[in-house]
């Protein structure tokens, strides 16, 4: 084979020409027509072909937590290139881009202010397209992802995910829900209080929604090709009852917040978007100790498994039915109303159940296991018809270890207050003009 410049330039391509391409380390043939088949139409919509997507597959009742990832694996890096840490103001506008290698600095190398209540430390995620499918013949769950507008795919709107657990702070006579470093997170509040405090910060803010968390969790699955977050970030082995009933000995911490291992921002010393620290030691008020490993993924600290539950907005369960908010940013109601839409029935049994509706990778309606606990985990009730249940995510120190992965719980009612329940801040991206869930046609 001669040098590239030794060959004359082709003219008037007809589509039946053959090219040599490098695929999985081997040189193979491809036609111009095949490459053109992946091109968008005149409306900018791409066809659903392997070149335009990365696909994650998992079999129902699969014992392993690992997944099969196929098609264009280079799409994973393209999707993750859309995400970055930043500081946003009270209008949810980016005021500083943080250094992805070292978030204590801006991209310009200047010191970053991560503890100012007027600027929230967030990770911008979303901005891609995805599609869920189920193959009944092979009993396989399939999720497809693309940075392109692929026909039949739904748009995942850009949004800001918290870098840190939620902190309630009073400023100007109003409580605000913050995502700041070097502060104690706030537990022992109800979801209405958290959401109100988020809205006090600005119209685009909200207490983190289940939909926000699901996107974050799916990105972990896609990046790690595995569903068991505790395989990478172990926070098991806590005495949950003791932890919940023992006040934090630090005088700066609220004594009602019994589930804090450290102030936010401890993982800022981890370079890059993910990793965990060496074992740290926590000392209880009675002198007892526990060790743990602070971690972060996608620049967000402690959102895959942790010592306390995080209350979420965006979904409700009542009378054995699940509902989701039609618009997670504008919905402020915590009761079933016109702002919610029905998605599926919940089982009418009493106890815990795993693997539920389509928004997860393990919908029980399609035959998923009710015992493996590979994903969602919530309380079902046999007779209740009036109470409203809300989702909680991440997992308590004992619950998370029982489940073995990031998880979803549901709580009894919207107004309870527990020392092992916190929340976190999320925000819409007002610069994104495409509605969430838009289907490419």
Predicted regions and their residues:
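Acidic glycine-/aspartate-rich tracts in secreted/extracellular proteins
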Residues: 23-26, 128-130, 166-168, 212, ...
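Short aromatic-cysteine micro-motif
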Residues: 116-119, 144-304
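Short, surface-exposed terminal/edge motifs of secreted or surface/virion proteins that either
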Residues: 21-38
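C-terminal, surface-exposed recognition/capping segments
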Residues: 214, 236-267, 308-317, 330, ...
């Amino acid at each position: 084979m001669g040098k590239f410049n030794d060959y004359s330039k082709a003219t008037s391509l007809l589509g039946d020409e053959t090219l040599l391409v490098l695929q999985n380390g081997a040189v193979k043939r491809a036609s111009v027509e095949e490459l053109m088949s992946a091109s968008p139409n005149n409306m900018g919509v791409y066809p659903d072909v392997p070149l335009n997507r990365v696909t994650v597959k998992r079999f129902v009742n699969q014992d392993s937590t690992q997944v099969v990832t196929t098609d264009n694996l280079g799409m994973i890096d393209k999707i993750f290139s859309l995400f970055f840490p930043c500081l946003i103001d009270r209008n949810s506008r980016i005021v500083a881009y943080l250094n992805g290698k070292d978030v204590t600095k801006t991209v310009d190398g200047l010191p970053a202010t991560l503890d100012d209540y007027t600027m929230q430390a967030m990770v911008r995620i979303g901005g891609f397209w995805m599609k869920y499918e189920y193959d009944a013949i092979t009993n396989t769950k399939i999720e497809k992802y693309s940075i392109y507008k692929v026909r039949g795919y739904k748009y995942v709107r850009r949004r800001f995910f918290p870098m840190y657990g939620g902190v309630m702070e009073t400023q100007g006579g109003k409580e605000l829900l913050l995502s700041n470093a070097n502060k104690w997170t706030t537990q022992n509040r109800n979801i209405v209080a958290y959401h109100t405090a988020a809205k006090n910060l600005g119209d685009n803010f909200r207490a983190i929604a289940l939909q926000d968390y699901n996107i974050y969790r799916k990105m972990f699955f896609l990046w790690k090709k595995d569903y068991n977050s505790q395989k990478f970030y172990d926070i098991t082995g806590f005495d949950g009852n003791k932890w919940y009933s023992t006040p934090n000995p630090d005088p700066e911490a609220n004594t009602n917040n019994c589930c804090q291992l450290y102030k936010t921002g401890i993982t800022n010393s981890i370079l890059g978007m993910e990793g965990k620290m060496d074992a740290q030691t926590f000392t209880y008020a009675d002198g007892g100790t526990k060790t743990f490993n602070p971690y972060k993924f996608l620049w967000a600290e402690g959102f895959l498994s942790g010592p306390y539950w995080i209350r979420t907005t965006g979904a409700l369960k009542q009378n054995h039915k699940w509902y989701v908010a039609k618009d997670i940013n504008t919905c402020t109601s915590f009761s079933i109303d016109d702002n919610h839409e029905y998605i599926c029935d919940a089982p009418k049994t009493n106890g815990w159940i795993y693997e539920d509706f389509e928004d997860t990778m393990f919908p029980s309606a399609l035959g998923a296991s009710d015992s493996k606990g590979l994903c969602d985990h919530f309380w079902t009730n046999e007779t209740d018809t009036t109470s409203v249940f809300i989702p909680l995510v991440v997992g308590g120190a004992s619950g998370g270890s029982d489940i073995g992965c990031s998880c979803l719980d549901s709580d009894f009612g919207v107004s309870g207050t527990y020392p092992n329940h916190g929340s976190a801040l999320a925000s819409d991206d007002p610069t994104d003009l495409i509605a969430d869930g838009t289907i490419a046609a």
